Each structure stands twice: as C-alpha cells, then as structure tokens.
Amino acid sequence: MSPLHFSFYSAFTFSSLGLAFHRTHLISALLCLESMMLSMFIPLSIWPVENQTPSFALVPILMLAFSACEAGTGLAMLVASARTHGSDHLHNLNLLQC
C-alpha cells in the first residue's frame, strides 16, 4: 500500500472514529461527516486520472454535490435545533420525544 493510499484510509478512519466518540454537539458530528466526505472525494478524483478512464470523471463532482446538500441540510438542522432547544447537543435531539 502506498503512503498516499494509507493517508486517505487513515483520514477516513480517524474521521469515522471522531464521529463515533465525539458525539456531544451536532456541529462536531457534521464536521466529522464532512471530513469523511472529503477523504473519499480526493481519492475518487485521483482514480480516473491514474487509470485514464474519463467516463468516471463525473463521479467526484456528483459526490461533491451530494456533500454540499448534506452540509446544507445539516446546518439547517443545527439552526432549527438551536432555535427550538436552545443548544446543539445531540442528546436533545431524541426522536422519541414529541
């Protein structure tokens, strides 16, 4: 495994561990999700160049568009929860409470 691939795998692993262990605030969970998306975006954008397959060149752009939609939805949830509950703690966002 090359050092470049190892760095991408470790970035994804560390951001998923951050999502698993630092789940106190919604903004920290959103940052971990965004770092996971970026750690997947960079190898996906390098892969068509290495393999010289231009048909897969649009896949990273599509993933980046979905990532932007996810970030916008997450920030809208952050603002809505801060307005209704007064904080962005994840333990306040229990769906079983009405």
Swiss-Prot record:
GO biological process, alphabetically ordered: ATP synthesis coupled electron transport
UniProt cross-references to Gene3D superfamilies, sorted A to Z: 1.10.287.3510
InterPro entries, sorted: NADH_UbQ_OxRdtase_chain4L/K (IPR001133), NUOK/Mnh_C1-like (IPR039428)
Gene Ontology cellular-component terms listed: mitochondrial inner membrane; respiratory chain complex I
GO molecular function terms noted in the UniProt entry: NADH dehydrogenase (ubiquinone) activity
Record's bilayer topology term: Multi-pass membrane protein
Domain of life, source organism: Eukaryota
Main function: Core subunit of the mitochondrial membrane respiratory chain NADH dehydrogenase (Complex I) which catalyzes electron transfer from NADH through the respiratory chain, using ubiquinone as an electron acceptor. Part of the enzyme membrane arm which is embedded in the lipid bilayer and involved in proton translocation.
Name of the molecule in the record: NADH-ubiquinone oxidoreductase chain 4L
Species the sequence originates in: Gallus gallus (Chicken)
Species classification: Eukaryota, Metazoa, Chordata, Craniata, Vertebrata
